Design a protein with these regions (language model features):
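Helix-to-loop junctions at the C-terminal end of transmembrane segments
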Residues: 61-74
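Short amphipathic helix-loop junctions that connect adjacent transmembrane helices
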Residues: 27-46
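Pair of pore-lining "gating" transmembrane helices in MFS-fold secondary transporters
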Residues: 8-33, 111
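Intracellular juxtamembrane helix-capping segments at the cytosolic ends
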Residues: 117-129
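Structural signature of the two symmetry-related core transmembrane helices
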Residues: 77-91
Length: 190
């Protein structure tokens, strides 16, 4: 019986973990702020339903990352796939919103985005690592910065739906940045 421990990936995961967990947590918070901001376009009931779907999908993604068959995969690969799934979801949301579709069409993209962000966050934080003060501070600052940036882009880029699309494009970019960071850390560890 042999036991294989991939120490290189664990070291790279520690280095990437704070930035990745901050990105994985700040993007859904910014998406939630955008959903609340687009309440005038969608209606308060639809905005609250989409916000609830986002929260449930994020929690579902975090639970999915704890699933035994997925825990056997390398952590950096799971982190990358979580970010890529989230980017696909936010891009689908962006396309549906830009296409002028009503709120039920946004549901699939928001669910995929939240699911991917939940997987990425749970993978980045890890099983037993407690949040340190610096980690918490980095996460809070990132959440505020991404939320403010998304709301400023939505407000000043273009009024109405187009501003929301630009702000969602920012979230897609940040999610792809997380996937790229995971891939670079994975290549450095190999």
């Amino acid at each position: 019986m042999s036991i294989y421990v991939n120490n290189g990936a664990l070291g790279a995961m520690e280095h990437t973990g704070t930035a990745a967990s901050a990105l994985a947590l700040s993007v859904p918070v910014a998406a939630g702020a955008l959903l609340l901001k687009t309440e005038s376009l969608l209606g308060i009931g639809a905005a609250l339903m989409l916000l609830t779907a986002l929260a449930l999908a994020f929690l579902g993604g975090a639970a999915l990352a704890r699933w035994q068959p997925l825990r056997k995969r390398p952590a950096l690969a799971m982190l990358r796939y979580g970010f890529l799934l989230a980017a696909a979801g936010w891009l689908l949301t962006l396309l549906m919103l830009f296409g002028g579709h009503d709120w039920p069409a946004l549901l699939a993209g928001i669910a995929l985005g939240g699911l991917g962000q939940g997987v990425a966050y749970r993978t980045a934080v890890g099983e037993k690592r407690a949040l340190t003060v610096a980690h918490r501070l980095t996460t809070v600052v990132s959440i505020v910065a991404v939320g403010v940036a998304a709301l400023l882009v939505q407000t000043y880029a273009a009024p109405g739906v187009r501003g929301s699309c630009f702000a969602l494009a920012l979230l897609v970019d940040l999610t792809l940045l997380g996937a790229l960071m995971a891939r670079v850390a994975e290549r450095d560890g190999a």
